[in-house]
Amino acid sequence: MEQFQEKVNELFAKHETLLSRKNIPLEDGNGIFTRYQHPVLTAAHTPIFWRYDLNEKTNPYLMERIGMNATMNSGAIKWNDKYILMVRVEGSDRKSFFAVAESPNGVDNFRFWDYPVTCLLYTSDAADEL
């Protein structure tokens, strides 16, 4: 139990280090765009609880259950004084879903919302109620 919890704490600590890492502008640029040292969002930014079953009884070896392969094709807006990305997240199985990540400055500290984007499916009966 104790060793499992230590591993979970280590996962969260490493993840927090990644999320809170300062993204430094690179010196060599063309004067039009500013390039940065790190990508603003990667598969490693996805929440730990999306990737791991954190229950020791059902995942005693703390194996990653849902592998993330990439984050891509983001659309960005500034909303409520935050920078919001609608991101296509690709799993290791190459199946994709959409998720929202936000940052206070648009350069670093991007954090995914707790849940991916879901769509409500309307049947003709449900549409009649609208």
Question: Where on the chain are the PLM-derived regions?
Answer:
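Short coil/turn motifs at helix boundaries and re-entrant loops, enriched in small/polar
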Residues: 48-49, 64, 107, 116-117, ...
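A detector of repeated loop/turn-to-beta-strand junctions in beta-rich toroidal repeat architectures
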Residues: 95-97
